[in-house]
Amino acid sequence: MNTCKPYCMFSNSGALTIRRLTVAVTMASLAVFASQLQAGESVEDRLSALEQQLAEVEPHARGDEGFSFNTYARSGLLLNNEGKSASGGPYLTPAGSVGGAVGRLGNEPDTYLEAILNYKSVADNGTRSHYRLMIADSTTSSNDWTADDGALNVRQAYVEFSNLAGFTGIFENASLWAGKRFDRDLDFDIHWLDSDVVFLAGTGVGLYDVTFSDAVKSNFSLYGRSFLDFPSDPDTTDGTSDTDNLILTANNYFGNVQWLINGMSAADNDERVVGNVMEAADSGVQTMLAYHGDSFFGLSEGNFSVALLHGQGLGAEVKSLGADGNLHEDAASTRIAVYGTTRLGDSWRIAPTILAETSEDRYVDGDEYQWLTFNTRLANELGANFEMQYEASWQVMDLETEGYEGRGDVDGDYARFTIAPTFKPQVGGFWNRPEIRVFASYSTWDDELNQYDGGDALGQEDFAGSQWTFGTQMEVWF
């Protein structure tokens, strides 16, 4: 599940730094001048003391030292036309079981939050350290106390060193880290779908920003992910074994071009029983070639990204790297992601997205999964604090499962349209938060999709055909 990436990419840290520094200067000035006027010191002494005081508080005001807090959170109600909780989520369709997301606007029934605590310090030799702790929780209950059904969890706990005094040459600007974390650069997402293009997380060690030239740099890392309690006896489905998937990563940048390569190894995972046979992969490879543009496909101001991903074996889960231990030894997947944002005049914004994947021999020999999602988010700014948001999402899928986990073969379309009056402190961009929105959504799909029975929402009670849903939601990050 995606989380919370925009607060990292689209922060207003510059403005916050200025405000912090202004407050710090004011407080320091008042304190120093008040005490020293009483002591009858000279102007020069008072200025010298003030400069020393500012030197002490300025790193904290800039955010270079001390504690800070970040968050991502969303919370809302999603109701059907009978006033009861409705099924929802970007992965509610059969294709969602293999990563096929649809639009999230007016389609999220949960409360999800991340509380991120940071502590930064600078050693006497100039080396910087950053400790981060992320605590996350998720629930679909509307109650205020959800300890029984929540999912409180520590998602990150790591330390990172930068500006290391002993690093020179190509390592002069490098950062060294260890612990449990989301990879800094392999955590970029298509926000409208709540889908990462690629996501790497786990426990390990790495080196960022090995700089070979102004335009060429690389990141290297080793992550571990646990495969727990999988069956290794054909006569039982009980979990009897476990192993670890080790992921060795090289993430390279050549200007706007990104090339990622991952190698994976999970000892004894080939003893896993999937579909009554032991043909699971114990190794794999995944690669991605991406381009990040600073315009809207060269047509107007804005931005865009295009990514082509391919994986085999354990790498056939091309998005959530190393996360799926059931993949077949011959599994192969290819995915493409295209998305961008731009303005259509002074008061309109648009963000189109295409995400598609084809895979074969994914879980059992002979299966084939194909799906494509087209999504567009549109916003019309109507005042200083109000805008109308619209989202249209269409997905087509052809899933031939060969009976994996009792799933049926399905072939069909899903479509959804949402209108969402939205309030915010200031309009002006897709990344301005917080937002408070109300919404109405209409979704429809082919009846055949109800037969998939792979844990998806379609075909469940009160959710077997065309649906209206209504609700409200807040979303915030900083």
Task: Mark where each language-model region is.
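Outer-membrane beta-barrel proteins
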Residues: 59, 101-107, 145-147, 193-195, ...
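Beta-barrel outer-membrane channel/assembly domains of diderm bacteria
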Residues: 40-172, 210-213, 220, 251, ...
